[in-house]
């Protein structure tokens, strides 16, 4: 069941990425970003990262809602462009979705397919029972793991947010 949930979430993630990268009206592009962010957090939650999924959901989607509100207010159109208005984008959207379904079906139905993932430090993310003092707090362990093993993730995320803000400021600045 968990495999099916992972495949469904991955398919929705790909569809939402195609949705906002096909550059429809900013209203629909922002909606695609919000859906992809929420589904990405669902994938993190599916693999057991409850604290990280919650933090990404709160920070990323909080920022995206602000950007979504600004782009909606600045680029309001009487007749917004949708995916159906451009036949090429719609056909590529359908073709990519069908390819994703075929690949997912092949991966599920093939008995000989073996996917090997090697996570060397995965045991460090597990919450252990210490015996006499009970369990460690999951939130504290999540923060410790984020800043010890995920230092590069924090740096890349911060840099991406700065670049995103600069791009939005440059686009909305005008002439």
Swiss-Prot record:
It comes from Urotrichus talpoides (Japanese shrew mole). It is found in: Mitochondrion inner membrane. The chain crosses the membrane at residues 1-21, 25-45, 48-68, 88-108, 149-169. One of its GO terms (molecular function) is NADH dehydrogenase (ubiquinone) activity. This is NADH-ubiquinone oxidoreductase chain 6. It is a multi-pass membrane protein. It catalyses: a ubiquinone + NADH + 5 H(+)(in) = a ubiquinol + NAD(+) + 4 H(+)(out). Core subunit of respiratory chain NADH dehydrogenase (Complex I) which is composed of 45 different subunits. GO terms for biological process: mitochondrial electron transport, NADH to ubiquinone; mitochondrial respiratory chain complex I assembly. It comes from the Eukaryota. InterPro entries: ComplexI_Subunit6 (IPR050269), NADH_UbQ/plastoQ_OxRdtase_su6 (IPR001457), Nuo/plastoQ_OxRdtase_6_NuoJ (IPR042106). Core subunit of the mitochondrial membrane respiratory chain NADH dehydrogenase (Complex I) which catalyzes electron transfer from NADH through the respiratory chain, using ubiquinone as an electron acceptor. Essential for the catalytic activity and assembly of complex I. One of its GO terms (cellular component) is mitochondrial inner membrane. Its EC number is 7.1.1.2. It is an enzyme of class 7 (translocase).
